[in-house]
Amino acid sequence: MDAFKLLTRSIKLKGSQLGSSSISSHLPSAGEANNPQLFPASEADKTRGTKRKRESGEDTELPNEIPVPDFFGSGSTAAESPKAQRKRVTGKDADAEGQHGEETSMPEEERKSILKSHKIKMTDLRTPPFRAVDTDISGKKSKRKKKKVEEPPPLTRKQLKAAQRLYPEPLTSFDKLRTRYHISRRLSDNIASQGYTVPTEVQLGSLPLLLGNAPAPNERTADDESLRSQSEREPDLLVVAPTGSGKTLSFMIPLINKIMKHHHDNPGLKEILAIVVAPTKELVAQIVNEGRKLTAGTGVKVSAVRKGMRIVEERGQETRSLEEENDGDDSTASSDEEIHSSEGEKSKDIPLTKSDILVCTPLVLANALSDGGKRDVAPLPSVQKLVLDEADVLLDPLFREQTLSIWRACTHPQLRVGLWSATMGSNIEELTKSTIKERQELLGLKDESSLIRLVVGLKDTAIPNISHKLVYAATEQGKLLGLRQLLHPTSTSSSTTHLRPPFLIFTQTIARAIALHSELMYDIPAEAGGSSRIAVLHSELSDSKRSDVMAGFRKGEIWVLITTDLLARGVDFRGINGVVNYDIPNSSASYVHRVGRTGRAGREGGVAVTFYTKEDIPYVKNIANVISASENLRGTEEGERIPKWLLDALPSLSKNDKKDLKKYGVKARRPSTISDKTTSKKTRISTKSGFDRRMDNKRKGAIKGSQRRKAREQLNDEESEDDVWNGIDD
């Protein structure tokens, strides 16, 4: 019985107060989630793998929460180092345990149970070297014909899947990184200082594969090294995990650990050992920022590739093409030599980068390795690890040529590749297999490297911890009205969609993002900050402007950010309360990445609202199917799901239509249709009357005409000055 309810029976509370308190208590901006896992294990699974017998000096119960510092206490107890925390929690020195303690291996049934409860599936994509044998059939035939040896029948599809499944021991706690996998003490402290306590599903499954159960550094011998090189080689990994599940941490920890071991074995040698490729500059800056937090005090340097950075040694003049040497006369040849020599002197003045990990977009690195396309791509023989973040985009036709050129430039025989994304099609898997095989044949490698696929949850599905709303708005004016209702909610009932700032708004094109920003610029009152609370971000802005907008949005100075698919992938905004798809995405994968900007690290309460009009109806079914799959995974009640009649009524797209939609977007909103007056009226983002638009166009035309007249007058003045006779020269 609720005592507060009994005591306030005669008091009429305002509905807005009740609604606001209930809504604000479950928002992503309210703080971090207690458990970052999307598919947490049951209580029975949590106790598995733990010791029943307590060690001497160990407490009966472990604290479930991080200790809160006493700000008013003495100075000696105000702060506590991570090492002291581990001593206080476990009652012994965790570092000593990591060097001398032995971890018992987990039984296979227990490993299977944990991986299944967290919805983790690992598959070896190599063809199994064995075949299934039917003993009854082979026995009968061997009696009749002893001389003839028959081959065993091929594996069935079910047997093949069972043979390819892997069940490695999962990482149940970040403490085991030090005790079992023997990572650096400094790296372990950096992980603890960032507040990482419980590994997410992708970290639980991928870190054991990438780190391996290596012996401790002081116990390693030559025999151990040879055994590890043969039986415990790091695999090529293809990971499909939900958005916001911690993929960056999953590939950065093994990279840093491997580079620190390389520095220990080769002191004084500085070279590029790992490359991380991402599709956007914003994602590159984010990865560098997270990497620098983890590498503090480790001696590992993480840098972003900038224009003009010198990555490889200067190549000789013999790489110039024969056409440049043979074309033209002697004077042109000598001038070309002077130009090349001056360029060579300038490049020699730029110091060679001393970074261990380079993070870049594909075009910047490809241009740096080929001098802007003037030469062949220079090899990178020292790179031992290549990571493709958002690999499905990097291997899409837009970036494929640049990404593959970087991949082929990494000529180290022990190169390992990691492909990470929330969506991964079968075509990307086939391209990965063919590229690895082609590279092995080119380098003459005989041993086939293992390629493992790790899938968390349902493949190509939106995260289940947010609510999805598909809203029919009929026209562009209806979408504007619906968006303003989200900005200024009037109803307090729980049935309506509540969306509190900060949130993102996605549009199809840059022009539409700019138009929507100008339309909503003054919707927030001046008392709350006015137009400074709404901003627009797209690729045509300068780098400094883009970084300023990103910084303002992270600080909370900007509440509503209007953007294109530039921010749809990888960028981590942990406190975003929702996402609005003002224009429907071009594909189901784009929808998964857009709505994944909210609900990061298991945060509940995020909302994804998608508006669609009459022109969008032929393209909505793919998005509706993704929403339906996410609702099934979440266990949404029947009344809150997308109705089945809507899924049945929406038309399906052909393969060619899907390709056109992915490449060009919805036909009615493509830039090529702007010239059509009828279509442009339907898709115009504006509430201005025709008279106001005509007056604006006249004013803009007058300004342009004035600028043209000034330019023409200035040109005439320069010509008249040249025509003036200055007399006879002395």
UniProtKB/Swiss-Prot annotation:
UniProt entry tagged with the keyword Coiled coil: no
Native organism: Coccidioides immitis (strain RS)
Motif Q motif: positions: 172-204
Entry binding sites for ATP: 241-248
Gene: ROK1
Record-level GO BP terms: maturation of SSU-rRNA
Composition skew (Basic residues), residue ranges: 700-711
Name of this chain's protein: ATP-dependent RNA helicase ROK1
Record keywords: ATP-binding, Helicase, Hydrolase, Nucleotide-binding, Nucleus, Ribosome biogenesis, RNA-binding, rRNA processing
